[in-house]
């Protein structure tokens, strides 16, 4: 484990401080970067997230995806958490905190907008960053891909009606461009790149294996034994080639995460300084929701006797959010400077530190699933 992985929480904390400092020092530069958007998806952030996702996509073996159906409980858990529990607990917590606990600190109109923003986060399960969290918990990359894909399909049909139900708004317009752009950037493109890379590594390792086999075939008369040896050699070379390639990528994956944190906090530096009390008030129920959903999902995974490499990602998909979609809908419904938009932004700021703490919990409780 390298210095970045060993002290990841420290590096993230430093990146948060650096992002805020740079955002205050060079606000124009961050505004220019923030303006580089396609369908409310920031291109620069997308590149860094792509750098984080790509290593896991290289690990995906399509020949093994068919085996995912042998353990459907992980998929079922993810679906139940994301669509039957999470949106409604988020709405309940938003109402409880902002109409009861924080009623003396927030005016009713602002409270309703904050609740709306929290609901939008609750109805949008993660598409991109879950690949990063899965990789950090040594999750099954094939299973994670299927989990994310199934949730993306459900989201297309369920996001608008659940959002309308909880917000009490009937004319919810799903920003299809944002949704499809995000799925393309964070799932399809890196997946294709990963598949092409894996095939290239296998082809090269196969060529090396064939070269070695021709050298030894002149000295061997047992053809069947030679064929078996050649197969094993090819598999061994392919695995070694993949392992070496992933080891080369690993530092870049962590650097991508830290760069993303710097950008996200740099974008919101002015808001963090100008409205710290509001941000704290919004962050509290969001953190309660995140840890609460994780506890429910993780304990359910243990009860279902899921293997650790499925239980971890299954518990993290629901706790992480599709913030691009939530921000886009908040802006379209309530406006750029609304309380709802602010709440979705706070969700972005809270997510990385909280999710890293959950990653640490999953890694330290691996023995629960043995």
What are the language-model segments listed below?
Residues 1-58, 63-319, 323-370:
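Alpha-helical transmembrane segments of multi-pass small-molecule/ion transporters
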């Amino acid at each position: 484990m390298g210095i970045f992985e060993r002290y990841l929480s420290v590096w993230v904390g430093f990146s948060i401080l650096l992002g805020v400092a740079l955002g205050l020092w060079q606000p124009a530069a961050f505004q220019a970067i923030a303006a580089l958007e396609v369908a409310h998806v920031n291109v620069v952030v997308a590149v860094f997230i792509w750098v984080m996702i790509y290593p896991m996509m290289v690990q995906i073996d399509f020949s093994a995806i068919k085996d995912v159906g042998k353990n459907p409980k992980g998929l079922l858990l993810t679906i139940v958490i994301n669509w039957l529990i999470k949106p409604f607990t988020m709405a309940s917590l938003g109402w409880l905190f902002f109409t009861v606990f924080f009623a003396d600190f927030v005016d009713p109109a602002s409270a309703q907008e904050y609740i709306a923003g929290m609901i939008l986060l609750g109805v949008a399960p993660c598409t991109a960053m879950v690949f990063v969290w899965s990789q950090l918990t040594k999750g099954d990359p094939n299973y994670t891909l299927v989990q994310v894909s199934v949730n993306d399909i459900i989201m297309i049909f369920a996001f608008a009606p659940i959002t309308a139900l909880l917000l009490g708004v009937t004319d919810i317009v799903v920003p299809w461009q944002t949704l499809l752009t995000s799925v393309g950037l964070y799932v399809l493109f890196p997946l294709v790149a990963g598949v092409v890379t894996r095939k290239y590594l296998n082809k090269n390792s196969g060529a090396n294996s064939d070269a070695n086999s021709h050298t030894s075939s002149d000295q061997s008369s047992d053809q069947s034994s030679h064929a078996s040896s050649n197969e094993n050699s090819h598999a061994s070379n392919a695995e070694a080639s993949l392992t070496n390639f992933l080891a080369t990528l690993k530092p870049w994956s962590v650097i991508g995460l830290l760069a993303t944190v710097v950008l996200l906090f740099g974008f919101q530096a002015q808001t963090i300084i100008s409205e710290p009390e509001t941000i704290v008030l919004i962050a509290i129920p969001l953190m309660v929701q995140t840890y609460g959903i994780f506890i429910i999902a993780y304990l359910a995974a243990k009860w279902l006797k899921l293997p650790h490499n499925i239980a971890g990602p299954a518990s993290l998909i629901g706790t992480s959010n599709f913030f691009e979609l939530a921000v886009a809908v908040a802006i379209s419904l309530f406006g750029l400077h609304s309380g709802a938009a602010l709440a979705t932004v706070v969700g972005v700021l809270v997510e990385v530190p909280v999710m890293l703490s959950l990653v640490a919990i999953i890694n330290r409780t691996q023995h629960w699933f043995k």
